[in-house]
Design a protein with these regions (language model features):
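The feature captures the beta-strand-to-loop junction immediately N-terminal to the Walker
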Residues: 39-41
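Helix-to-loop junction immediately C-terminal to a conserved catalytic motif
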Residues: 54
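Conserved ABC transporter NBD signature motif
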Residues: 62-77
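Conserved ABC ATPase "signature" region
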Residues: 101, 112-127
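Catalytic Walker B motif of ABC-type/P-loop ATPase nucleotide-binding domains
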Residues: 156-160
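H-loop/switch region of ABC-family ATPase nucleotide-binding domains
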Residues: 191-192
Length: 215
């Protein structure tokens, strides 16, 4: 495969916080229509790598390119990405639907009826009036996934997407992610649950001490 066919290219990236080097010469190539899994202990550098790919952190060394454009030179290029890295700051007194509607409107999107199908796709009732502050952890996680997919992104960056979900919820979200893969989406996910990784992922990488290696 030619390098221009890769959607995300991480090339020799290093990142330090003071004297702590958390990413060490990391390289990764990702293409559409695949799910990439990232495993590793807490503090191994997974979240820092995700934040760097999403443009939330700059690299000390190396480059990250998305669709051929180098991160840092084009701030808008990840608008097509759906991201779960930390729990979104939903307005706790609003319903799930109204939270999504507010974000959708901010992004100048018009077809709000589309949000009903998005919520149903992640297993939430769009007519539910309950404020997000009274949602269970699993319901909040479903809402976070709905936010990530509501604009039909070509790229999904998901840190522990199954967190807080019960057995049925895990099954539903796995099926959703596999469906999105079939739609030629690129998905990168981190999980401590090896079963999620084994069921979903085409390629698996381990982060240990800031070093990335393929398993």
């Amino acid at each position: 495969m030619d390098r221009q066919d890769y959607v995300i290219e991480v090339s020799h990236v290093s990142k330090s916080f003071k004297d702590n080097k958390v990413l060490k010469d990391v390289s990764l190539l990702c293409e559409s229509g695949k799910i990439y899994g990232l495993v590793g202990h807490n503090g191994s550098g997974k979240t820092v790598l995700f934040k760097s790919i999403c443009g939330f952190l700059s690299c000390d060394e190396g480059t990250i390119s998305v669709n051929g454009k180098v991160m840092g030179k084009d701030k808008d290029m990840l608008n097509e990405a759906g991201i779960i890295i930390e729990e979104p700051g939903f307005l706790r007194t609003w319903s799930g639907y109204h939270n999504l509607e507010f974000l959708y409107t901010l992004r100048n999107k018009k077809n709000k009826k589309h949000l009903y199908s998005v919520l149903e796709e992640v297993g939430l009732d769009p007519r539910l009036k309950r404020p997000v502050g009274k949602y269970s952890l699993g319901m909040r996680q479903r809402l976070a996934i709905a936010q990530a997919i509501m604009e039909d992104p070509g790229i999904l960056i998901l840190d522990e997407p199954m967190n807080g979900l019960d057995k049925n919820g895990v099954k539903e979200i796995r099926e959703l992610l596999l469906k999105m893969k079939e739609e030629n989406k690129l998905i990168i996910l981190a999980s401590h649950n090896r079963e999620d990784i084994d069921v979903l992922c085409d390629e698996v990488y381990e982060m240990e001490g800031g070093v990335l290696r393929r398993l």
